[in-house]
Amino acid sequence: MTAYHTSKVDRKSMRRYRLERIRRQLRQRDYGGALLFDPANIRHATDVANMQVWALHNKCRYVYVPTEGPVILFDYGCAKHLSEGYELLEQTRTAFPHTYFTNGPRHGEYLENWAKEVADLVRQHGGGNKRLAVDKLDPPATHALERLGVVVTDGDELMEWARTIKNADEVVAIREAIAGCEAGIEAMWRALKPGMTENELWAHLHATNIARGGEWIECRLLTSGERTNPWFQECSDRVIQAGDIVAFDTDLIGPNGYCADISRTWVAGDVKPTGEQQRLYGVALDNLHHNLALVKAGLSFREFTEKSFPLPEEFVARRYSCLMHGVGLADEYPF
């Protein structure tokens, strides 16, 4: 249990499993370790959360995971206390800022000091293997490591594969995230009425997610009426009218940091859907049921693609970007 919500997840078991998944990928690729900046990857490796959205665009946190040896979290300057009690962490250090945002004109000087600390870890705990998987790193930082003999390799591929297969604890976490998301969807459904704006309706999902221990919502995909097509227009102050289709995609990061990615469409007001609305909804349902029936263990991506729902030509130009995608701490591979 964290300070934020109660959960049935066995956190210690989940942490052990996720860390071993990373190390299995490191061994398979003959890497000496990984250096992770992506907040979702840090969460997967350590379970420690700290201002994750801010950290998406500020490299203020990172974790070093050797194939064998101590896991060391580098956290934001005054936030080392946040990792207390996380049993898989051998050590928490203050992160060494190495971006222009934090260091200004002295950026190069601080960058070299950061690289020396990382290279020292590789020498101490890499067992002679200087291949380091890094998920997100600017070119100057990459070059600084390479000058010190570190061989920078692809950490994104490694982490996507590490995150592909969930254990029973993660399944519980995903179900809890879905339950929270469904509660938010119900809150939106109850609140929906003609005359409110898209933003006002969307706020009910955010409020419910936070109240139930959720974390954030990745996109703003709720539109109504003519704004539903083409898709990917963002939520706005448009006033919803009676009879409008209201469409949304939750992209919600819920309790335990797990994603619930649910799409729904409704008709606003006490209005019977038009024949065209019913036709479109029927095609969407046929698509879902057809593709879901294909999913089974051992199915290849190619077989799934070849047998997937034959989309009518009228929808091809504005079809979605993928048939299905993985999900976990975010949208994940395969996509």
Model-predicted segments: where are they?
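Active-site neighborhoods and metal-handling regions in enzymes and metal-associated proteins
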Residues: 1-335
